[in-house]
């Protein structure tokens, strides 16, 4: 099927974050550390670690930084981060999910709440918007890296166990059941595809247009959340401008 490109949005955010590369690497180091600490330092036996390492490489994080975070997890460090999800609404009633890794839950909760309230949003209770999103595996193949056409990619995706294929001018975007994500990713790599992105993500069941007079506030809110050192991911149900 065809549709709006989540990959296009990701690329836009990535370009915007290039100026904040140090902060991005700091967050990725934390994710790598936690993945290695909880599941072991070998990515071949730790799918979560492998996924985060792939994410770090896609962000052009130096290999030495990745190795340092893994070695730290192997050592005697007693650093611990809690995984917390915050839920709320952005200006215009757009649902927002915020995933954080924090060593101080009170600090992070306060910072997230301030970001919402200062930018026209509201932080909600647990369960207030999470039901509006589905956990999915998300894999991207840059069309410039393959000679396969849409029909061939669709066949390979179905053979691999993927759920859905969306096409855009620059990418093939594959969605999977989260439990099948690793198997689908590995099958597509074995089939010779070079993956531009492979991660677990949250997909909104429905999208909400951001009112024109709320777009600036909406952007400021998302920027404030993504700039927070403890925030790993921000997901919204905002509709693209071309939807």
Swiss-Prot record:
InterPro entries: Integrase-like_N (IPR017856), TACO1_YebC-like_2nd/3rd_dom (IPR048300), TACO1_YebC_N (IPR049083), Transcrip_reg_TACO1-like (IPR002876), Transcrip_reg_TACO1-like_dom3 (IPR026564), YebC-like (IPR029072). The keyword DNA-binding applies. It holds the Pfam family TACO1_YebC_N. One of its GO terms (cellular component) is cytosol. Keywords: Cytoplasm, DNA-binding, Transcription, Transcription regulation. One of its GO terms (molecular function) is DNA binding. GO terms for biological process: regulation of DNA-templated transcription. Its main location: cytoplasm. Residues 1-22 are annotated as: Disordered. It is found in: Cytoplasm. Belongs to the TACO1 family. This is Probable transcriptional regulatory protein LGAS_1276.
């Amino acid at each position: 099927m065809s549709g709006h490109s989540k990959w296009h949005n990701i690329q836009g955010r990535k370009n915007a974050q290039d100026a904040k590369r140090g902060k991005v690497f700091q967050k990725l180091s934390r994710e790598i550390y936690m993945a290695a600490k909880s599941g072991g330092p070998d990515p071949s036996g730790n799918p979560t670690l492998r996924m985060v390492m792939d994410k770090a490489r896609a962000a052009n994080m130096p290999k030495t930084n990745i190795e340092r975070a893994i070695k730290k997890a192997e050592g005697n460090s007693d650093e611990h981060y809690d995984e917390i999800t915050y839920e709320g609404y952005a200006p215009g009633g757009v649902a927002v999910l915020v995933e954080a890794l924090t060593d101080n839950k009170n600090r992070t909760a306060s910072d997230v709440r301030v970001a919402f309230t200062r930018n026209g949003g509201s932080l909600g209770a647990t369960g207030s918007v999470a039901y509006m999103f589905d956990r999915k595996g998300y894999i991207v193949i840059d069309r410039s890296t393959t000679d396969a056409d849409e029909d061939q990619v669709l066949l390979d995706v179905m053979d691999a166990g993927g759920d859905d294929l969306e096409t855009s001018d620059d990418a093939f975007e594959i969605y999977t059941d989260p439990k099948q994500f690793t198997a689908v990713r590995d099958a597509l790599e074995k089939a010779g595809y070079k993956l531009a992105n492979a991660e677990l993500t949250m997909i909104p069941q429905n999208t909400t247009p951001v009112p024109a007079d709320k777009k600036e506030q909406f952007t400021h809110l998302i920027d404030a959340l993504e700039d927070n050192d403890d925030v790993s991911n921000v997901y919204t149900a905002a509709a693209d401008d071309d939807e």
